[in-house]
Amino acid sequence: MSRYQSINPYTNEEFASYDNSTAAQIDDAINLAHALYKKWRHENPETRSRQLHKIADALREHEDDLAKMMTLEMGKLLRESREEVELCASICDYYAKNGVKMLAPTPIESDLGNAYYLKQSTGVIMACEPWNFPLYQVIRVFAPNFIVGNPILLKHAHNVPGSAALTAKIIRRAGAPEGSLINLYPTYDQLSDIIADPRVQGVALTGSERGGSAVAEAAGKNLKKSTMELGGNDAFIVLDDADPQVLRNVLGDARTYNDGQVCTSSKRIIVEKSHYEEVLHTLKNVFSNLQAGDPLEAGTTLPPMNSERAKEKLEAQVKKAVYAGAEIFYQYPEIDSKGAFFRPVILTNIDKENPIYDEELFGPVAEVFVVDDDDDAIQLANDSSYGLGSSVISNDIKRAQNVAAQIETGMTVINGRWITSGELPFGGVKKSGYGRELSDLGMMAFVNEHLVIDVTKNNQ
């Protein structure tokens, strides 16, 4: 792809485009980031902590601009874009408040001497981020590494270049040193060259399984540490003792937030028999009451998908599923718009031979399965190549915790849908990737655990 393009998915019209970065621009960016890394090595993280609080304030100050840009580029509801900005500001505040303590040396009990390990920066990190949360995906990597002292080079998705540029601009104007976050528009070949550069010490990617595999291969080839946050086919398990009100509340936006374009959103709704009809009709009520329209307008509850290409891919997946025997319980009426609107749909009767059984459907599609008991629910949940997130709905918390512990996944929410916050680790297993972002675990993703041990007494 030769250019990064801003195309409004509500109108399908391009309103901005950005040329690829030149080789000279990329080299200058790496030089600048590497020089900052060297400088930061001699500074205390307390300074960066104060700067990160200012960045949080700046994000809130520019909420309107950021939210509008995200909505224009990838189509999410404006109110959800505003929520994303506040979430990102809170993540910055979280690391500004707690990051310095997290980086304190950790003592080690040893008979060999006085031992501890330092938590030190490692260098420039290449961040490859997706379009579905244009600000959050960036801040999730930037904020902890800013405290650690690892500058970030950003390659954002091809359809949100304006969001990437605006984010970098606001962070710089908030007082972050030049080189803290540098936005680039590289080609895929240039990205491989960046990863291979000895001044770059790690790669963080959130994206598709295909993209993650290619970038992880490049990182491994060059012995660079990487974290991969990839797709999900998450299970939403409804046990037979689920509270009906809790169930209705949670299903209210479990498959519609961000138009279903959330990697941790529950794609597979696994229901024990007694709640099956209730779940189907609750989802139908949610879907049928959506109002398609301009995502900038307050009354809209069903926005377009992020692109015409994404809509067509999802339509093809649903068509393939139905051809293989899946049944449509409900589908939203036709939408008279030139925008990238997908009609929300509820699918049932999906067997293991169906080609979508182990695919991620990234949009407002609910796949509903019926099972006999907890064991069947767990078995079905784990019969997946993915393991990112899950939900368990039950009135018995201990029972829900027991089920949660048996799911092969990175995250489980009891009596709720997916959730994220600065203090909560984010990541998955299987083909959903490896490593963690956010919390103290994410803070240590690209840290050098540097052992120091004093054995003077043994050699006197």
Regions from the PLM with identified roles:
Residues A16-S21, A35-H42, A127, F236-L239, ...:
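Short, well-ordered beta-strand elements within core beta-sheets of diverse protein domains
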Residues Y37, R41, A56-E63, A67, ...:
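Structural signal for hydrophobic packing residues in well-ordered secondary-structure cores
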Residues A104-V246, V371:
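Rossmann-like NAD(P) dinucleotide-binding subdomain of oxidoreductase/dehydrogenase enzymes
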Residues M1-G113:
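N-terminal Rossmann-like NAD(P)+-binding subdomain of aldehyde/semialdehyde dehydrogenases
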Residues M1-Y4, S266, L388:
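Short loop/turn microsegments at loop-to-beta-strand junctions
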Residues T11-S17, V200, I237, E334, ...:
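Conserved C-terminal structural/oligomerization subdomain of aldehyde/semialdehyde dehydrogenase
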Residues F15, R210-D351, I414:
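ALDH superfamily catalytic-core signature
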